[in-house]
Amino acid sequence: MLSIAHKIFGSTNSRIIKSFHKVVQDINAIEHEIQLLSNEALKHKTIEFKEELKNGKTLDDILVPAFAVVREASKRVLNMRHFDVQLIGGIVLHKGMISEMKTGEGKTLVATLAAYLNALEGKGVHIVTVNDYLAKRDAEWMGELYSALGITVGCILTETNDLERKNAYNCDILYSTNNNLGFDYLRDNMKFSRDEMVQRGFNYAIVDEVDSILIDEARTPLIISGQVDQDIKMYKKIDNLIYELAEEDYELEEKNRNIFLTEAGITKIENLLIQHNLISSNTSLYDIDNIIIMHYITQALRAHKMFAVDKDYIIKDGNIVIIDEFTGRMMDGRRYSDGLHQALEAKEKLNINSENQTLASTTFQNYFRMYTKLSGMTGTAETESEEFLGIYNLQVVQIPTNIPVQRIDLNDDIYCTEEEKFNSVIKFISECHKKLQPVLVGTVSIEKSEMLSKLLTKNKLKHSVLNARYHEQEAYIIAQAGIPGTITIATNMAGRGTDIQLGGNLKMLAKTALANITDKEAIEIKYKQLTEKVNRDKEIAIQAGGLCVIGTERHESRRIDNQLRGRSGRQGDPGLSKFFLSLEDDLLRIFGSDKIKGVLQKLGMKKDEAIQHTWISRSIEKAQHKVESRNYDIRKSLLKFDNVINEQRKVVFDQRNKILDSDSYDISIIYRDLNSDIVNSIIHDKYYNLDDDTYKALSSEFTRIYNITLDYSTISNFESKDKVLEHLNETVDEHFAQKIEEFTLKDQKAWDHVVKKVMIMSLDYLWRDHLAALDSLKCGINLRSIAQKDPLNEFKAEAFSMLENMMSKFYELIIQRLSHLKFDIELNDTQRIEYNIHHSKISRNEKCPCGSGKKFKHCHGA
């Protein structure tokens, strides 16, 4: 029934493409008119468009001429003309949708259309990439086009300093990575003044490789943290005990990535702990005093049984470096949380670093949803269209290719064992190599890529390896993977963002070959020779069948497999793709149904013999779909909890910004409310007789908060609670009036400066502890379901109560810190304020964890 409706009305995707095609016709209709403009007149169009927007026109009103101007500028500056399908892609981006375009269809150029149009409003456009290399490359490459139209372009890399960042954010268009943008947001909300902040708002973002950033990294929190005191030696002690455990002592759930001790394991580990004097003989492992020990054990088990070197992480310069499971790239600076990273360091016998406490955090899901308009580009988004729509309200639109795809996708070959599979892979590569067909082999881990490399070396097949160990050469290696006879091994989607061009990448080859040539004539001759060679090599590669992509294992996500296939057959080039699988592969072993294995056995699988069947391929896709659905459910569930924290983050950051934006502060409102709370908590009756206990309680609180000693003889004469409160308010009024007078003796603004700094420091201090408390609450909240309670509702209620409590502490802490302030006016008339405040256990000479680059004592530890 659905297919009949599609035939009559067309799919949603085809209807969108059809409607946008009419806009493309309008753009094409004025192409000749725009061609007649001089370079200056073309550039002046930007000023005209901005005037039209000021006079009431919308971006949609000027889309047609704006896109035509960008296309003409691109022809003149880059010698690249936007195809009609690229114009459709640009419209999709402008409309706040995801443009799914196949590899090689020119996504980088497509982004210029929507970026230019939206930059005309002057509110800023952010083009987001997955790494610094792509951000720098695209900013320099497309920057020439924007410059020709009078549009400013900025680029932020990891090493960019604060001043350069601020200037870049003030540009019309900014290129940067998701990590840089997210951490800048967190750092800005740890700054002490608006002037120190670098970002200017969240107007419009175009996210390149949107599936990688908004899906694959959705569960990865962005965290700024500082070290906390911890018993580091305990990790080593517990790690030594893990070797004593046998398989029957623990149960591993690979599907859910869980591990726990069996009854036999609990008994064994308890005895080992007692033997090593880590717990007393009359206690249980699950006693309240031993909960922290249980935490160390769980993380040590996970480190040993669930995480593997060269798959989940590598050891580099004596440190554990996490490997991104989706891209195969190193994630420098990232650390596993909750003690897992320390457990891995203990496992690998490395120096153990202290666990960190979160100072500020957010997720990419919540960060990118702050933008007024969001759009994205990728080669593979359709399989995750439900998630994009459900979480980000982003519709996926599949853009037709400029030239039909010529790639042939062969059926999967399935073998009994991994050894048989890899032997067949080597044989297949060898056959391709004989006819000079370029080959790209995708593996799921560094371990597998290096194992395959050894087999190729053994068979005397020259090749390049692209994995996290060789990240620096990534772009060059992948760019030359289309040269005839080239064999390239890549982990997952390493090199994503760089096209594989048949015959080789002329631009990169020229950059290397011409680096040491200075003579202009010699450069021209060499460049011509390189061009001829690339064209010859391209023809040889085409005759050999184009790029052959080999997958050595199916990924949990169909999208990752499609990305690998998509490296072949760019812009109508011929190509080939094939997957080699075995029953020992993780996907088939963990998620493949017994039905698949049963059918394969009935078919009589023999050694070194592959089985091909469309039914088996469909069954594998069903297994992948199950995993994708489960992962989506996990992300959706986590998002509901993250949304609670995100709402609180907005409240706290909004409060912080209000403090920063104020020039003067009336703290009397705060301390009068505080005094009322103190009196009401100690004196319960309106009329009372002051006894020693009541006086001591009042005096103790006032000394603690205000550093004031109450006079017993004075307050003992009051007959009502209201009179006591009135006297206390007057006492505190005098206390702060004297303090303000002392602070403003040389500088009228000194007191307000002090109040602002104390308020900001107090809020940061409490927010840090509040985040830790929320993390602890979230870790155990699912246990509430045992009592037939909804964990999410329980989390919302308790988190709200905790926030209220935090804000109460905040106001008290402000008054307490201001009351205990010391001041010192030096002879040179510059005022130095000394705070008698314990802020953190971070060394004062360490760099501040907020990321400012300053020493802690000159920043948040001031």
From Swiss-Prot:
Q: Might you give the EC number(s) for this enzyme?
A: 7.4.2.8
What's in the keyword line of the UniProt record?
A: ATP-binding, Cell inner membrane, Cell membrane, Cytoplasm, Membrane, Metal-binding, Nucleotide-binding, Protein transport, Translocase, Translocation, Transport, Zinc
List cellular component terms (GO): cell envelope Sec protein transport complex; cytosol; plasma membrane
* Free-text cofactor note: May bind 1 zinc ion per subunit.
Is Membrane one of the keywords UniProt gives this record?
A: yes
Gene Ontology process terms (BP): intracellular protein transmembrane transport; protein import; protein targeting; protein transport by the Sec complex
The UniProt annotation places ATP binding at Q86, G104, E105, G106, K107, T108, D499
Q: Which CDD domains match?
A: DEXDc_SecA, SF2_C_secA
Q: Where in the cell is it found?
A: Cell inner membrane; Cytoplasm
The answer on whether this UniProt entry bears the keyword Cell cycle reads: no
Swiss-Prot/TrEMBL cofactor(s) = Zn(2+)
* Membrane topology annotation: Peripheral membrane protein
Its recorded reaction(s) are: ATP + H2O + cellular proteinSide 1 = ADP + phosphate + cellular proteinSide 2
Q: What is its main location?
A: membrane
Positions with a binding annotation for Zn(2+): C848, C850, C859, H860
Which GO molecular function annotations are given, in alphabetical order?
ATP binding; metal ion binding; protein-exporting ATPase activity
Spell out the InterPro entries in the cross-references: Helicase_ATP-bd, Helicase_C-like, P-loop_NTPase, SEC_C_motif, SecA, SecA_CS, SecA_DEAD, SecA_motor_DEAD
Q: Which PANTHER family match?
A: CHLOROPLAST PROTEIN-TRANSPORTING ATPASE, SECA INNER MEMBRANE COMPONENT OF SEC PROTEIN SECRETION SYSTEM
Regarding protein family, the annotation reads: Belongs to the SecA family.
Subunit text: Monomer and homodimer. Part of the essential Sec protein translocation apparatus which comprises SecA, SecYEG and auxiliary proteins SecDF-YajC and YidC.
Q: What does this protein do?
A: Part of the Sec protein translocase complex. Interacts with the SecYEG preprotein conducting channel. Has a central role in coupling the hydrolysis of ATP to the transfer of proteins into and across the cell membrane, serving both as a receptor for the preprotein-SecB complex and as an ATP-driven molecular motor driving the stepwise translocation of polypeptide chains across the membrane.
Question: What is the protein's given name?
Answer: Protein translocase subunit SecA
